[in-house]
Regions:
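A conserved beta-strand/loop element that lines the FAD pocket in flavoprotein oxidoreductases
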Residues: 8-13, 131-132
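Active-site-proximal loop/helix segment associated with metal-binding centers of metalloenzymes
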Residues: 7, 20-96
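Short acidic-hydrophobic surface loop/beta-edge motif
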Residues: 3, 14-21, 124-126
Length: 152
């Protein structure tokens, strides 16, 4: 399901595969808040921040339908291993059931590029994993190109 937010902004719902502009895109939102002790439930923190087991199973079923092959992966956080390599086990970014699911995807999914945005900085981690924060990219045949940083 796609929810239209504005004429140029769309919400790709969790655990689904989309065909957009010739790209097969898998989207899986969610991340664990590392600062939830400072947040208020229902105002700045929601229990639904992590996908349910049913949502993860629907995601697996959607990937089965495309033989575990997509062009682009869009997530908020990254796999347990990459998160560990980025932050060297900092307590604020701990392993959880979602990062473990992303680890499973990283090891088994055939994909070209994986974009995430949870970590509040932009960086190309390796040839396939890209963290985006204040950067907009355009997909190209060979991968992607940075268009411009978002002005603050």
């Amino acid at each position: 399901m796609i929810q239209k937010i504005t004429s140029h902004i769309f919400h790709l719902c969790r655990g689904q595969v989309f065909q957009i502009e010739g790209y097969r895109i898998f989207a899986m939102g969610g991340a664990e808040s590392h600062d939830k002790a400072r947040r208020k439930e229902g105002v700045s923190w929601w229990r639904e921040e992590l996908p349910t087991e049913a949502e993860v199973q629907r995601a697996r079923a959607a990937l089965e339908c495309v033989n575990w092959k997509v062009d682009i992966v869009l997530t908020h956080s990254l796999s347990t291993k990459i998160q560990w390599e980025l932050f060297h086990g900092m307590l604020s970014y701990t392993e959880n059931r979602l990062t473990d699911f992303f680890q499973e995807l990283d090891e088994n999914l055939d994909f070209r590029l994986w974009f995430s945005g949870h970590y509040h900085f932009s960086k190309q981690f390796d040839e396939r994993h890209v963290l985006l924060y204040d950067t907009i990219v355009q997909l190209t045949e060979g991968g992607f190109r940075k268009c411009f940083p978002v002005e603050k």
